[in-house]
């Protein structure tokens, strides 16, 4: 069909509409998917939507946004990235708490978001209970939680859980779904 007929661009085509419908069914959430070209773009768009330039983003010291994305998240969001040392690539409330200061002080970056990778860059996986503990703490401090789901299908398989059970049900605010590493030909979705 795509090579034989005309389709409107900019999301007004049957393929985009079908993808949006499937995403909403999968997550059973009122969400507005944004399709982007690659993982860095997905993370940057997600973090831009969640933060303001005077804020900071907390992440594991091994996190993709800190180690591998060539400073794009810092450049595009204006936020400071605050790496947190972890023994296994996973953040915990106990590891996050020491970074929860400076709120209301114009001389300090205000913690605005927590970034998680599922699976982590070290191959570890967050359980729903671990995710809920992090999102609860973050939300208590008015912060949002972003999940980089470049390899989330592996976490779903390892834990035998659905995408919804590892995101929406755990309080994750924004997911960057990695299409390429999760079985699609190309592209990502916020």
Give the role of each language-model region.
Residues 1-190:
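Conserved PLP-enzyme active-site core in the AAT-like
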């Amino acid at each position: 069909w795509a090579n034989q007929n005309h389709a409107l661009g900019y999301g007004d085509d049957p393929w985009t509409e079908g993808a949006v419908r499937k995403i909403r069914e999968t997550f059973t959430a009122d969400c507005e998917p944004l399709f982007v070209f690659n993982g860095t773009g997905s993370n940057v768009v997600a973090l831009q939507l969640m933060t303001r330039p005077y804020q900071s983003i907390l992440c594991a010291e091994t996190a993709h946004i800190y180690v591998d994305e060539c400073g794009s998240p810092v450049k595009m969001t204006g936020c400071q990235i605050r790496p947190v040392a972890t023994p296994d690539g996973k953040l915990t409330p106990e590891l996050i708490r020491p970074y929860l200061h400076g709120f209301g002080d114009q001389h300090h970056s205000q913690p605005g978001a927590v970034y998680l990778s599922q699976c982590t860059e070290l191959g570890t996986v967050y359980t729903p209970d671990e995710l809920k503990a992090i999102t609860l703490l973050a939300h208590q401090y008015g912060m949002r939680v972003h999940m980089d789901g470049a390899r989330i299908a592996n976490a779903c398989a390892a834990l035998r859980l659905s995408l919804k059970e590892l995101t929406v049900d755990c309080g994750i605010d924004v997911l960057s779904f990695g299409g390429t590493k999760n079985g699609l030909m190309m592209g990502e979705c916020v």
